[in-house]
Regions:
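Residue-level marker of positions within ordered structural domains that often coincide
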Residues: 128, 158, 169
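Active-site segments of SGNH/GDSL-like serine hydrolases
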Residues: 95-98, 166-170
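Catalytic-core region of carbohydrate-active enzymes that cleave or remodel glycosidic bonds
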Residues: 140-162
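Chitinase-like catalytic core of GlcNAc-active glycosidases
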Residues: 1-143
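Short, conserved beta-strand edge motifs with alternating hydrophobic and charged residues
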Residues: 124-126, 163-167
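Glycan-binding loop/region signatures in secreted carbohydrate-active enzymes
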Residues: 168-240
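Charged/polar, solvent-exposed surface patches and flexible loops
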Residues: 40, 44, 118, 148, ...
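Helix N-cap and loop-to-helix transition residues
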Residues: 31, 112, 142, 158, ...
């Protein structure tokens, strides 16, 4: 098995709300016993999969700073439940990128790093997503933002607990017209690096292969400050 083959790897079971605010809110407020059921289910799956080293909690799209006390209490209850079942079980929590208290660019101000430090063994900070499907084109993890997250997190949390997430994806933004006129909600579509390469080499095109365009002119640019590559497809004129 993989576990026997790589015994140095910790295997965690991810429990997530898939970014549904309604689920986060119900768990936080224990609506109709939602949090009680959630905690009992965590115990159930640890019993079902005894080989797991612990739990990875990925709860996203919480609410504003006014809910931070209740949100912290929820994570406290999760942590205590895991440790009561087995103190050796590892608990990782996934946290939004923040540069200060009440400093989320995405409205995730329920999260206060310093308050959550006591209720995790490790914390994976989602330090990516500054640029996203609905934003203007730009680096997914701009340097100043990434450094701000690092500086804040290491001051209020145990640095040995912290893992920073790095983006392994990019975006293809359509900027020649508004999303409304294109029949889309957002102007951006996520890409792997391989997909981005296919755009640049003509594997993908904007004509849906009718007819295909074998030679797609691009301008490529490397932002050495933010360490981010850019590619501008369909540039037919000189660019300086």
């Amino acid at each position: 098995t993989y576990i026997n083959r790589w015994p140095h790897i910790k295997w965690l079971l991810t429990v997530a709300n898939d970014g549904a605010n309604s689920i986060f809110r119900a768990l936080r407020d224990n609506t109709d016993g939602a949090q009680d059921r959630f905690l009992s289910e965590i115990v159930r799956i640890m019993e079902k999969y005894p080989w797991c080293d612990g739990i990875d909690i990925d709860l996203e799209r919480g609410d504003g700073y006014s809910t931070h006390t209740e949100s912290t209490a929820m994570f406290c209850n999760i942590y205590n439940t895991v440790k009561a079942y087995d103190p050796a079980k590892h608990m990782n929590i996934c946290l939004p990128g923040m540069t200060s208290v009440n400093g989320s660019v995405g409205g995730e101000n329920w999260c206060v790093y310093g308050d959550l430090d006591a209720y995790c063994d490790t914390a994976s900070i989602m330090s990516y997503g500054m640029a996203w499907a609905g934003s203007a084109p730009g680096p997914v993890s701009p340097r100043s933002w990434l450094e701000g997250i690092y500086d804040y997190a290491t001051k209020v949390m145990n640095p040995d607990k912290i893992f920073l997430g790095m983006p392994a994806y990019g975006w293809n933004w359509q900027i020649y017209d508004t999303p409304e006129n294109l029949g889309k909600t957002y102007r951006g579509t996520s890409n792997t690096y391989y997909a981005a390469k296919l755009w640049m080499t003509g594997g993908y095109n904007f004509t849906d292969d009718a007819p295909p365009q074998p030679f797609l002119p691009i301008v490529a640019y490397w932002d050495d400050y933010d360490k981010a590559p850019y590619a501008f497809p369909h540039v037919y004129d000189y660019m300086e």
